[in-house]
Swiss-Prot record:
Glycosylation sites: 184, 274, 285
The gene coding this protein: YKE4
UniProt key word DNA damage: no
BP-aspect Gene Ontology terms: intracellular zinc ion homeostasis; zinc ion transmembrane transport; zinc ion transport
Regions that span the bilayer: 3-23, 70-90, 100-120, 127-147, 203-223, 253-273, 291-311, 323-343
Family stated for the protein in its record: Belongs to the ZIP transporter (TC 2.A.5) family. KE4/Catsup subfamily.
InterPro entries associated with the record: ZIP
UniProt topology in membrane: Multi-pass membrane protein
UniProt xrefs under PANTHER family: ZINC TRANSPORTER SLC39A7 HISTIDINE-RICH MEMBRANE PROTEIN KE4 (PTHR16950), ZINC TRANSPORTER ZIP13 (PTHR16950:SF16)
One term of GO molecular function: zinc ion transmembrane transporter activity
Species whose genome carries this gene: Saccharomyces cerevisiae (strain ATCC 204508 / S288c)
Keywords: Endoplasmic reticulum, Glycoprotein, Ion transport, Membrane, Transmembrane, Transmembrane helix, Transport, Zinc, Zinc transport
GO cellular component, one term: endoplasmic reticulum membrane
Protein name: Zinc transporter YKE4
């Protein structure tokens, strides 16, 4: 079976899991269990997936839902970090390299795809007050803008991307120290946004394991396929923003901690009141608040960090070379968006 079919199939099941685990459990407790069983019956029709899920259930996810969820989120966060080690050109840390430029373009596609195809639609799912969702997105954007501006004022810098946008070669000792340290506001904002995003993912994943082990495993596989291109794009943003390879790895580890925190919160919410509706209601409320806020932060990062890097010309004297480079960048933007569309295909 082709990889694209595998991804499409897995992700066609996962949204159902997350949907009834995070957004609809408040009103459809018995319906959720039926949906869980139905999803696993569908899985049985594909012997490869049935065998894989049974193997994982018997050899890896052998404990209760709390521990299974923690194990799953650790594996999910480890996979993208291992994946970046095999991408050529990332260790060189050359901000002008074509590889990094194309990865930044890919990250813009995945970022926009995540915002437009996943985060915002998920925020609007089952919500009657659309204005509140829009307000939360706006609040997220303004919060990241305020944080960015505050950090710039406190650090005494007016443009953290000076090496990209400025033609001046004079630097104060403070600016030189910041450059050596890989100091970049947008990169840190990307880390903060990643933490918030991973918290919501962790809550959803934990809820799926409390639905059933099989559903939790299916969700874990689907989320892994989703996270690899997403984390690869985030990694490219960090490198292009001035982080060294080890710094980017450490930053990704910090965002991974957010997923563990989110999973722990999800487990706590599901266990409160002996699996009563109170747990799933709290989980849904937390997710409804976090998702649109995260969308606002992601929009800020895309518009102030990623897009300016793509607009930057590395060889302004060669117009033909720049047009060829832009053509490749445009292709990678579409590829990134298409990957996220495939990941979120219902």
């Amino acid at each position: 079976m082709k990889a694209s079919h595998i991804c499409s199939y897995l992700l066609s099941i996962a949204p159902l899991v997350v949907s009834h685990g995070v957004h609809h459990n408040r009103d459809h407790g018995h319906e959720a269990n039926h949906e869980s069983k139905q999803s696993f019956l569908i899985l049985k029709q594909e012997s490869i997936f049935y065998s894989l899920v049974c193997f994982l259930q018997n050899h890896l996810f052998v404990l209760g839902p709390r521990y299974n969820a923690i194990v799953a989120i650790l594996i999910i966060q480890l996979m993208p970090c291992l994946f970046v080690l095999f991408v050529p050109g990332l260790r060189k840390n050359d901000r002008a390299s074509l590889t990094l430029s194309l990865l930044v373009s890919f990250s813009l596609g995945t970022l926009l795809g995540d915002i437009l195809l996943h985060v915002i639609p998920e925020s609007l799912s089952g919500v009657t007050d659309v204005t509140m969702v829009g307000g939360a997105i706006f609040l997220g954007f303004i919060s990241f803008l305020t944080l960015d501006k505050t950090m710039r004022i406190l650090s005494g810098t007016s443009n953290d991307d000076g090496s990209i946008h400025s033609h001046s070669h004079s630097h104060t000792p403070q600016q030189t120290a910041e450059k050596k340290a890989g100091f970049n506001m947008s990169a840190y904002l990307n880390v903060i946004s990643g933490i918030a995003h991973h918290i919501t993912d962790g809550i959803a994943l934990a809820t799926s394991f409390y639905s059933s082990t099989q559903v939790g495993i299916m969700t874990s596989i689907a989320v892994t396929f989703h996270e690899i291109p997403h984390e690869l794009g985030d990694f490219a943003i960090l490198l292009s923003s001035g982080f060294t390879f080890p710094q980017a790895i450490r930053a990704q580890a910090v965002t991974a901690f957010g997923a563990v925190v989110g999973t722990s919160i999800g487990c706590w919410m599901n266990e409160i009141g002996n699996n009563s509706h109170k747990a799933t209601s709290s989980s849904a409320n937390a997710s409804e608040l976090m998702l649109p806020f995260t969308a606002g932060g992601l929009i800020y990062i895309a518009t102030t960090s990623v897009v300016p890097q793509i607009l930057h010309s590395s060889a302004p004297d060669s117009k033909l070379r720049e047009f060829k480079k832009w053509a490749l960048q445009l292709v990678f933007i579409f590829v990134g968006f298409a990957v996220m569309a495939l990941m979120d295909e219902h």
